[in-house]
């Protein structure tokens, strides 16, 4: 089993490190297991933009990389919300430009979803 490939994909989903290196490593890896993309990952990514740790363009690049990885599965029960987040953020030319305000709006939606889920309330 290629645990290193899965770890590299986990790093991308968690946006743990420099984005260009994460995307390059994820493209070169061949994970043998899937990695889950959860609401907490989307919250953390949107927060990076709202607090100034990442640019909106970086969020677009990250969302594209996550969205188009075959080995990334969306959190069960929240596929619609998370797929909508990835599609809208990864294709601003089809929806609206990604801005700090767009990220704040997504944060409210995602945090409300987490808060309404007894299993994740307070644990994202």
What are these regions (language model features)?
Residues 1-124:
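Acidic, Ser/Pro/Thr-rich low-complexity regulatory regions
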């Amino acid at each position: 089993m290629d645990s290193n490939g899965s770890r590299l994909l986990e790093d991308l989903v968690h946006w743990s490190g420099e984005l260009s290196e994460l995307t390059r490593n994820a493209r070169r890896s061949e994970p043998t297991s899937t990695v889950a993309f959860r609401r907490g990952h989307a919250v953390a990514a949107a927060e990076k933009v709202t607090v100034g740790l990442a640019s909106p363009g970086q969020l677009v690049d990250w969302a594209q990389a996550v969205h188009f990885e075959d080995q990334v599965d969306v959190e069960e029960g929240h596929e619609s919300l998370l797929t909508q987040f990835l599609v809208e953020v990864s294709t601003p030319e089809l929806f609206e430009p990604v801005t700090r305000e767009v990220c704040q709006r997504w944060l409210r939606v995602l945090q409300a979803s987490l808060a309404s889920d007894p299993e994740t309330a307070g644990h994202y």
